[in-house]
């Protein structure tokens, strides 16, 4: 370690701050600019206050609109439960006459 002048404040020690100011750029070079840039830009960690988003309240008129919409039919099970069904004999005969097998 290099000897440091005791009369200097810790934040004014040589090498404690980069010569160029921090920017809003998120390129690789700027993300590794200093420790603050690395934690906020590179890692995405910020300890500032988070703004709470306010929900947009729906006016009363839109609630009436919801009631006027026709209700969708309930989703049915996949497949066709009432579709045509082949008998086992027909399937077996097709399997025997299949030239690809």
From Swiss-Prot:
Disulfide bonds: none annotated. GO terms for biological process: DNA-templated transcription; positive regulation of transcription elongation by RNA polymerase II; positive regulation of viral transcription; symbiont-mediated perturbation of host chromatin organization; symbiont-mediated suppression of host innate immune response; symbiont-mediated suppression of host translation initiation; symbiont-mediated suppression of host type I interferon-mediated signaling pathway. One of its GO terms (cellular component) is host cell nucleolus. Residues 38-48 are annotated as: Core. The modification Asymmetric dimethylarginine is found at residues 52-53. Zn(2+) 1 binds at residues 22, 33-34, 37. The keyword Transport does not apply. Residues 83-101 have a biased composition (Basic and acidic residues). The cell attachment site mediates the interaction with ITGAV/ITGB3 and ITGA5/ITGB1 integrins, leading to vascular cell migration and invasion. This interaction also provides endothelial cells with the adhesion signal they require to grow in response to mitogens. This is Protein Tat. It comes from Human immunodeficiency virus type 1 group M subtype F1 (isolate VI850) (HIV-1).
């Amino acid at each position: 370690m290099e000897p440091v002048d005791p009369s200097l404040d810790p934040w004014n020690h040589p090498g404690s701050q980069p010569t160029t100011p921090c920017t809003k750029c998120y390129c690789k070079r700027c993300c590794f600019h200093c420790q603050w840039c690395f934690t906020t830009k590179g890692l995405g960690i910020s300890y500032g206050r988070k703004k709470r988003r306010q929900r947009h309240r729906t006016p009363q008129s839109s609630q009436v609109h919801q009631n006027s919409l026709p209700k969708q039919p309930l989703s049915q099970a996949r497949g066709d439960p009432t579709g045509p069904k082949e008998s086992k004999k027909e399937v077996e005969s097709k399997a025997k006459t299949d030239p690809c097998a």
